[in-house]
Structure formats: C-alpha cells, structure tokens
UniProtKB/Swiss-Prot annotation:
UniProt xrefs under PROSITE patterns: CYTB_CTER (PS51003), CYTB_NTER (PS51002)
Any Gene Ontology biological process: mitochondrial electron transport, ubiquinol to cytochrome c
Principal location class: mitochondrion
Subcellular locations according to the entry: Mitochondrion inner membrane
Name the record gives this protein: Cytochrome b
One GO molecular-function entry: metal ion binding
Binding site for a ubiquinone: 201
Obligatory cofactor(s): heme b
GO CC terms of this entry: mitochondrial inner membrane; respiratory chain complex III
Originating species: Pronolagus crassicaudatus (Natal red rock hare)
Topological type in the membrane: Multi-pass membrane protein
Other comment: Heme 1 (or BL or b562) is low-potential and absorbs at about 562 nm, and heme 2 (or BH or b566) is high-potential and absorbs at about 566 nm.
Subunit structure: The cytochrome bc1 complex contains 11 subunits: 3 respiratory subunits (MT-CYB, CYC1 and UQCRFS1), 2 core proteins (UQCRC1 and UQCRC2) and 6 low-molecular weight proteins (UQCRH/QCR6, UQCRB/QCR7, UQCRQ/QCR8, UQCR10/QCR9, UQCR11/QCR10 and a cleavage product of UQCRFS1). This cytochrome bc1 complex then forms a dimer.
Function comment: Component of the ubiquinol-cytochrome c reductase complex (complex III or cytochrome b-c1 complex) that is part of the mitochondrial respiratory chain. The b-c1 complex mediates electron transfer from ubiquinol to cytochrome c. Contributes to the generation of a proton gradient across the mitochondrial membrane that is then used for ATP synthesis.
C-alpha cells in the first residue's frame, strides 16, 4: 500500500519539501540557516501575537502598556524579551545566510536570490517598525530620523513624509499604522519564504563545492532533519541565554525613557543590526546621496549574479576571492562599530573609508580577483 504522505494532496507537498526531497550529500552546517530563519519567524509570530494581546498602539498608553506587559502579565517579561532578542537572532541568521550565499555562489539561482533580497527588505522594514512600538526615546527619534530621509526625494519628498506620518510629525497616526504594518508583514514574509523555497526546489540546493550534485543525492529525512534539529536546539539555547541572563545587552538604555518630542537623545542610533547601513548613510554629507547609498548597500546584492566572472561557482577553491570575501566581512564589522559611534573625528573618516571600501570590494575587487584566478588556472 502506498504511504499516505505520497498520495494525499496536502501531505504530498510537505513530503516533497521536507521528507523525500533529494539533497546534496555534502552540504555543511552553513546550509542550516534557512531552517533556522523559519524557526526565528515562527518564534517572532508566536511571541508577537501574545504581545499584541496586551499592547495598545496609542501615544498616551503605548509605553505604559509595554511596562504593564513586563510587570503584570504572566511571563510577560519573558515574551517581550524573547521577541526583542528573537529579532537579533533573526538578523544574525539572516546575515550568515546571505554571507553563505555569496561565499558559495548561491546567487546564480537568480529567482531564489531575488526573492531572498525582497525578504531581507521586508524583515528590515518589520524590525524598524517594531522598534518604534514601545514608544521610548529611541523609538520616537529613530522613527523621526529614518522616515525623514524620504524628504530627500526630489519634488514629492515632503508630501511623502507627511503622508507616511499621517500628520506633520511622528504621532498617534504614525504609531497606529506602524503597529498595523508590523503585525501584517510577518505573514507576508512567511508567504515570500514559501515562494523562496518553491524556487529553490525547482533547481535543488547548491553545495560547498559548487558543482552539480545530481549523481550524489540523499533524502532530506532523516539525515538533514536531525541536522536541523541540532541547529534548532543551539539557536534556542543561545536565545534563552541572551534573554534570561542579559536581556538588555543589545538594546538601548534611552528606550527606557518615554518618548519626548522636546528632548533629543545625545546619540540617535538604530538597533545593532542596522548600524552598518546607518554608517554608510552618515558617511555621505549629501542627504539624497546618503539615502541612495543606504538603499544601494542592500540592493547591490541584486547585481551580484552579473558580477560573477569566475569559471568556478563556489569560493571553496579560490583563495584570492576568499581574501576579498573576508575583507568584506571585516569591513562590515567596522561599519557596524562606526554606526554606533558619535559623528566626530576620527569616526567620520573611518566610516567614509569603510563605506567606499564596501562598494569597491563588491563592484571591483571581487570580479577582478575572479578574473585573476581564471588566468592562473589557464581557464
């Protein structure tokens, strides 16, 4: 008798995606981050739902409703900190996942890659709007500064900003709509993630060597379900360590002060996972130029398939490209550090050099390194 998972219309889809899926036999732990991102999304939706039951999106009560969640709701503090630190875990997995894609040449699956870029933008937008909701000082001023960037758009900029604000400043209308968008976006992300998987399963997974693995495939279950479960346990352990021992390690103390439009914090900065982009934005003196650089810092990923000049797909056997890749990683760490520093000498200069280097490595040095490697290998 045929197994029900192979004939039932619904189970059949799950079977082809999670059980009988032919998977390369040599994929490493770097391929775990896709499933870890799925787990992060599930944790965020689950904790977010319970937070939304107690949260009020009104400027008068938003801050005190978050205080109420932490003090009066049963395990409210745990749900709140799991949600806040869950966002950090989400971005750690996200950046490692993108880094893996760049290193092993996964961007050659252009549909999967482009949906991934859309997912990255959607997650960033969701995280930004979520940071506004507690209505602390950094929430308010972060929202003011970032939404104000749209005023750099010629002709329609000012009208666009006021339209997003729902008034002449960040106020009740802004908070209400941000809450609505923050609630709906994770479900859009889930739909996009399904599309991401759909396109991935059209081509099959890449592998560390970058060569086709059709002759050497193994079923996803039990081999990779076990491997993913280990990743799940490690992620949950790390999240619990962060949440239970140092819940405010990655947050900003300013956000424990209620939003006050009359008092500007000394250093306005976003959450740590946006600092690299914020540093690029700040390093350009022109407002419109800064906004364009900010968008391009992520959108540059979309042109990666066109910048691939190597005859090999993966960087596994390309030492010069590996040096370029790790220089890029170090550069991003420098940008993250600079984004959290005040706008003064020498941080401004370091930020400008690191920003130029970021674009130069991706646009010039990496394609050039690939061409040199081709030449050395006489390809």
């Amino acid at each position: 008798m045929t197994n029900i998972r192979k004939i039932h219309p619904l189970f059949k889809i799950l079977n082809h995606s999670l059980i009988d899926l032919p998977t390369p036999s040599n994929i490493s732990a770097w391929w775990n981050f896709g499933s870890l991102l799925g787990l992060c999304l599930a944790i965020q939706i689950f904790t977010g739902l319970f937070l939304a039951m107690h949260y009020t999106s009104d400027t008068m009560t938003a801050f005190s409703s978050v205080t109420h969640i932490c003090r009066d709701v049963n395990y409210g503090w745990l749900i709140r900190y799991l949600h806040a630190n869950g966002a950090s875990m989400f971005f750690i997995c996200l950046y490692l996942h993108v880094g893996r894609g760049i290193y092993y040449g996964s961007y050659t699956y252009s549909e999967t890659w482009n949906i991934g870029i859309l997912l990255l933008f959607a997650v960033m937008a969701t995280a930004f709007m979520g940071y506004v909701l507690p209505w602390g000082q950094m929430s308010f001023w972060g929202a003011t500064v970032i939404t104000n960037l749209l005023s750099a758009i010629p002709y329609i900029g000012t009208n666009l900003v006021e339209w997003i604000w729902g008034g002449f400043s960040v106020d009740k209308a802004t908070l209400t709509r941000f809450f609505a968008f923050h609630f709906i976006l994770p479900f859009i992300i889930a739909a996009l993630a399904t599309t991401h998987l759909l396109f991935l399963h059209e081509t099959g997974s890449n592998n560390p060597s970058g060569i086709p693995s059709d002759s050497d495939k193994i079923p996803f279950h039990p081999y990779y379900t076990i491997k993913d479960t280990l990743g799940f346990l490690m992620l949950i352990l790390l999240l619990l360590l962060l949440t239970l021992f140092t819940p405010d390690l990655l947050g900003d103390p300013d956000n424990y002060s209620p939003a006050n439009p009359l008092n500007t914090p000394p250093h306005i900065k976003p959450e740590w996972y946006f600092l690299f982009a914020y540093a690029i934005l700040r390093s350009i003196p022109n407002k419109l130029g800064g906004v364009l650089a900010l968008i391009m810092s992520i959108l540059i990923l979309a042109i990666m398939p066109f910048l691939h000049t190597s005859k090999q797909r993966s960087m596994m056997f390309r030492p010069i490209s590996q040096i370029m890749f790790w220089t890029l990683v170090a550069d991003l760490m420098v940008l993250t550090w600079i984004g959290g520093q005040p706008v003064e000498y020498p941080f401004t200069i370091i930020g400008q050099v690191a920003s130029i280097l970021y674009f130069t490595i991706i646009l010039i040095f990496m394609p050039l390194a690939s061409l040199i490697e081709n030449k050395i290998l006489k390809w």
